[in-house]
A protein has these predicted regions:
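Phosphate-binding P-loop
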Residues: 2-7
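Hydrophobic anchor at the beta1->P-loop junction of P-loop NTPases
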Residues: 12
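Conserved lysine of the Walker
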Residues: 20
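Hydrophobic positions on the alpha1 helix immediately C-terminal to the Walker A/P-loop
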Residues: 23, 27
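Short glycine-rich substrate-engagement loop in P-loop NTPases that contacts/grips substrate
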Residues: 42-74
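Structural recognition of the conserved hydrophobic beta-strand(s) that form the central parallel beta-sheet
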Residues: 77, 101-107, 128
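Short regulatory helix/loop adjacent to the ATP-binding pocket of P-loop NTPases
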Residues: 110-126, 141-142
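Interdomain hinge/linker elements that couple catalytic modules in large macromolecular machines
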Residues: 135-178
């Protein structure tokens, strides 16, 4: 949120399943809650089959350009952008051609490649996401009051700090196979 409306591409990076997509979903909701019209937000998860025909950056550029709001800033939120070949060319063109604020996630190896770094040098900021720390893990999960701090730490060591694990019930006496 601190880089919102700054003329830099915001690249959310982190290991797989650390919550990058969830962060973008929360940001989308934040925009709506703060008065941004839904028509001024384009949020696409490019792994969805809905976008299967957008693998070429020119087709992708045309598709998105047709949907950019005619007035006011448009927020472009792209998840798993690396599925678009030469996506960095489309992103730079959006920056140049429209009043947009751009947020992207995807595979670290593709997003921070040399070609991309060269094209957008000085025009992007990386937002690194890490798994939850032990303190965040304690704040994030609900444990029964009778579970000791040692047992909670063992759960943290066993399962790590991935937000998806919130779906598991650590209080139940059952084995979770990873």
């Amino acid at each position: 949120i601190q880089n919102k409306d700054v003329d830099l591409v915001k690249i959310v990076t982190g290991i797989r399943r650390c919550g990058k997509s969830s962060l973008l979903d929360l940001f989308h909701q934040h925009l709506l809650n703060h008065g941004v019209a839904d028509s001024n937000i384009i949020h696409m998860n490019l792994e969805s089959l809905r976008y299967r025909d957008l693998k070429d950056y020119l087709v992708f550029y045309d598709y998105v350009s047709e949907r950019i709001a005619k007035s006011g800033k448009t927020y472009l939120i792209f998840d798993e952008l690396q599925v678009i070949e030469h996506w960095e060319k489309a992103i730079e063109s959006f920056r140049l051609d429209f009043d947009v604020d751009i947020y992207i996630t995807g595979s670290n190896a593709y997003l921070l490649s040399t070609e991309f770094s060269t094209l957008l040098s000085g025009r992007y900021v990386e937002i690194r996401m890490l798994p939850l720390s032990f303190k965040e893990f304690l704040d994030f999960y609900e444990f029964a009051p009778d579970i000791s701090i040692e047992e909670k730490f063992q759960k943290y060591l066993q399962f790590g700090g991935m937000p998806i694990l919130r779906e598991y019930r650590f209080n139940e006496a059952r084995s979770i196979q990873a």
